[in-house]
Amino acid sequence: MRIVQIIDSLEIGGAEKMAVNYANSLAEKIVFSGLVTTRREGNLKSQISNKVSYLFLERNKTLDLGAILRLREYCKDNKVEYLQPHSSSYFTAVLVKIFLPKIKIIWHDHMD
């Protein structure tokens, strides 16, 4: 399995911590575990395992085509099969899926 967690930032918070924990735990059990931060890095970056592939997109607007294309290339280069966006990062995952329709999305909503 080749899976990437997608989260808006690595500031300290519940969804952010869960994304880091998932990426770290999966890195011990599967072929490829990645973590992509779309908008901001933060204090949780230091907790990412060196076994996790990390990408910071530096996305600065809702529809940042450059960031989407960088994520698409990252997914292609790493043969990613699953995207697991957390909360509002779902939109980013859907845009990547338009370019890479074989990728499956597992949405993790933290609102309820």
Residue ranges and their predicted role:
Residues 1-112:
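Membrane-interface segments of envelope glycosyltransferases acting on lipid-linked substrates or membrane lipids
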